[in-house]
Amino acid sequence: KTDYEANEGRSLDLVTTLGEDVRRYPVRTELFSRDDDLDARVLEHIDAFFAGLPAAGPDHEAATRGPWWFFLSEKVVAITQGRSYFVWDIKVGRPARVLSRYVTRTPAGIGLGSPFTMQLAIQEAGLPRVLYASAGGAIGKVIGRKGLFYELVGNQINAIDGPTEYSAYPSNVSAKLAPKDPDAVAARLSAAIRERVPEPWRSTFGGTVIMDANDIGRNVLGSDVPGDWTRFEEMFA
């Protein structure tokens, strides 16, 4: 598959609820590791995309004449920051084992329903805050208010991912935290992209969006684009 073709079962084009016609180009990469230089890897693919654009056909050149943004998976950022861990390297304590039993699992992923991911949450937010949020979450279930745990715990704990059997290696044996300082990462990447991309695309580049996405929703974790980010979450559908 080239970078100018849709993924299987997907379409390049989308019309948002605001009536915007959007084209999404899924750029395929190799696996990332904590030893990778994120900026260098990203710029390599940006260079290749625009270098191949003229040969891709007039339809693609026409579609890229307007404003555009670069979307990046938060997993890639977290992995290159060293915030992804093999499960055998995570020292799980008793609180994590106990608390993880009371987490409702969803089809979107394991969430904090694993001792490994719960341990990362405790390390990131602190045990007192996790206990406080757990108590609030239990009350939220009684009164019918979903998501109260994540509101109370903060620290982007909702972006923690755990190992799943259907994931490709190493995600099937890893758990990861949310990326650190995603707004700053987005701003840094945008500055580097603006230095590399030729005109006219340099002038129409709007910025970088770091996205957390799964089967039930999308959430922008960081961006250097001002304003409401919900439109970007819809574009990523």
What label would you give each PLM region?
Residues 1-237:
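N-terminal and secondary-structure boundary signal
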